[in-house]
Structures are given as C-alpha cells and as structure tokens.
C-alpha cells in the first residue's frame, strides 16, 4: 500500500490516484493539516516490536506497517487544528508543533522504503552548491557559478552577462493581496560594480554566467522513465519569461513534448542515483550550438502543468512506479 503524504489543497496526486485505482494499487492519503482532526495515529517501538497504524477517524481507511510498500511525499504542512478547541494559543501551537515533529520523524523512520520525495535524501539534494558539483561529476555542462558577499569576486567571471538567482528565499509577502517573488534576473559586471560594496556584502549572492538560449528544456524523471518538454522562452520579453521562464505563465508561454538526447537522460539518472532518488525535475538551457547546460534539479517539482500542456503520461508513470513496488512487496 502506498502512503501519500500531502495536504488537502494539493491537486497533483489526483490524476495519479485515478491511475492507482485503475491499476488496483491500494493507497492511503494523509493530509497533514488534519492530522489531529481526521486521523488516529499509533506507533509502537520496543525490543520486540516496530509497528504503526494510521486510520481515518471514521474507520473507513487505514494503513499499517505491514501493508506499506512505498511513500510519496508531496506537499505536507503543519497541523492546522487540534481535535478539540484549545483556548490557550501558546499551548495549541505547541501541540501542533509536536504533531508536525512526529510527522517529520515518521518520514525519517520510513527512509528505507521506496520513495518519491524522499524525506532524508531530498534535503541533501536541495543544496544548490552540491547540485552543481554532482552535475559536473556526472558530465553535465554547468555555467560558471559564484556564491559570494565580496564584490571583487565578480571579476572572476569569464562572461560579461551574469544571472542573479535566489539561494533559498523565493520571495516575501508585501501585503495580504501582494507577494514579491524572486525570479532570476539578468545583469552584468558593470551594473554589479555600480551597486557598491555595501549593497553586495550584506547578502550571500548566487551568481551564474548567463548563457544565451536557443530554448529551454524541462525533463521529469520517474524511476528510469524520462519525459521532456521544450520551452520556447526566447520569443518573450525579459520580464515575461525570456530570462526566467516561470514569468511566462501569464503571457502565453507554451510547452511541447520533446525527446532529449539519450546521453543527457543517462546523466539525469546518474545525478539522481548519487542522491539515491527516483524522481527529479531538471531544467536545462540549450544554447545556439545545441549544447545542453544544467541549471538545477527540483527533486520534488511540479509536473501536472507539463502533462496538461503536452499530454505526456507523467501521472501514469508515477502510478506504474508505485504499482511495481506494491507488486514486489506482495510477491
């Protein structure tokens, strides 16, 4: 039985669940914001025992340590409520933190099972620095990359054009109606010099040599299967997807099914194998010489928009991946 760990608003599991039902693969969906209000949780550990059971409070669905065959972590979040109303807000928050702590430790305890969205290995794979190191080791071309809070280090770049990226912070809330999102931006050495040392030294800046693009590619790996889409981003203006294709969502950017070279697909598999992962969404720039340049891998990335645009059978491939592990446990 597959354990799906996510939240109620996450729609990505839905098409996969449709395939799981058709394939007769049992599953249990745990929406973590309702941990206390919708589920009964039991885990016993002793010298003789290591067993758990999670069941819905209506008793209609459950999963046990004997049944579980794989885990799919999508988008879990902290418990939003306790079962009973707690008037003391500090106490209520403490109890919800305890519930969230249990869920984190449960995912770590299940680390030896087959996973997509592996709770332990994904943390390591999320390092922007290690990703570049491993990408180079497996044979990818990577842009010259510098992390620095010293303005003089900009002179190390071999190219004049430089991409500025966020390391981990993706934005912040300006108001209840408005958020500021950090996208990749294009600059150059002269503009960075003009910032001055004071504006540079208060941040650990993530900088890459900017590569002029022919087009971009998004490749999704599930197990040994790969699905790629070409992104025609260069027809758009700089702030509408040309520099960071994510800005093109609202401006008519299109995605088409695409076959990447087998050598690139193999390097994707080698990259994930280093981290002992079975899933990853890779972003590439393809330059005007048809050379692929690795940008990053999101090891729990979104993919449903690609399936909707291209009809690539990604959700079916995820279901088949979990079916294989269900059958292996049953045999």
Task: Give a label for each model feature.
Residues 1-3:
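Extreme N-terminal starter segment of soluble prokaryotic enzymes
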Residues 7-19, 30-142:
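Conserved N-proximal alpha/beta basic substrate-recognition cap immediately N-terminal to
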Residues 20, 159-257:
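Phosphate-binding site of ATP-dependent enzymes
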Residues 26-38, 167, 172:
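A short beta-strand-loop structural module common to alpha/beta enzyme folds
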Residues 46-48, 57-58, 221-226, 287-290:
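Short acidic-glycine loop/turn motifs at beta-strand connectors
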Residues 130-182:
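Loop-centered beta-sheet repeat module
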Residues 162-165, 219-221, 290-305:
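A short beta-strand motif that forms the metal-chelation/ATP-contact edge
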Residues 198-205, 209-210, 221, 238-291, ...:
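A long amphipathic alpha-helix within ATP-dependent nucleotide-binding catalytic cores
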């Amino acid at each position: 039985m597959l354990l799906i760990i996510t939240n109620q608003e996450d729609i990505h599991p839905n098409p996969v669940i449709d395939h799981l039902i058709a394939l007769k693969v049992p599953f249990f969906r745990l929406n973590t914001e309702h941990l206390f209000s919708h589920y009964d949780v039991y885990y016993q550990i002793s010298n003789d025992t290591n067993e758990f059971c999670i069941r819905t409070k209506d008793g209609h669905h459950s999963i046990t340590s004997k049944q579980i065959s794989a885990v799919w972590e999508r988008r879990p979040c902290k418990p939003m409520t306790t079962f009973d109303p707690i008037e003391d807000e500090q106490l209520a928050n403490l109890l919800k933190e305890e519930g969230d702590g249990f869920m984190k430790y449960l995912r770590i305890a299940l680390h030896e099972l087959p996973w997509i969205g592996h709770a332990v290995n994904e943390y390591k794979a999320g390092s922007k620095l290690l990703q570049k190191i491993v990408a180079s080791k497996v044979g990818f071309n990577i842009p010259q990359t510098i992390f620095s809070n010293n303005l003089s280090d900009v002179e190390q770049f071999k190219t004049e054009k430089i991409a500025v990226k966020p390391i981990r912070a993706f934005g912040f809330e300006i108001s209840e109606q408005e958020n500021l999102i950090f996208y990749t931006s294009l600059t150059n050495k002269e503009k960075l010099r003009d910032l001055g040392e004071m504006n540079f030294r208060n941040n650990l800046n993530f900088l890459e040599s900017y590569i002029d693009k022919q087009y971009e590619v998004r490749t999704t790996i599930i197990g040994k299967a790969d699905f790629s889409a070409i992104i025609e981003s260069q027809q758009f203006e700089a702030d509408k997807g040309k520099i960071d294709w994510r800005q093109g969502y609202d401006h008519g950017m299109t995605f088409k099914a695409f076959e990447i070279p087998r050598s690139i697909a193999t390097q994707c598999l080698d990259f994930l194998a280093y981290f002992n992962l079975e899933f990853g969404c890779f972003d590439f720039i393809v330059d005007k010489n048809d050379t692929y340049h690795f940008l990053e891998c999101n090891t729990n990335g979104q993919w449903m928009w690609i399936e909707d645009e291209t009809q690539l059978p990604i959700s079916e491939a995820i279901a088949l991946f979990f079916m294989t592990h269900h059958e292996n446990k049953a045999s």
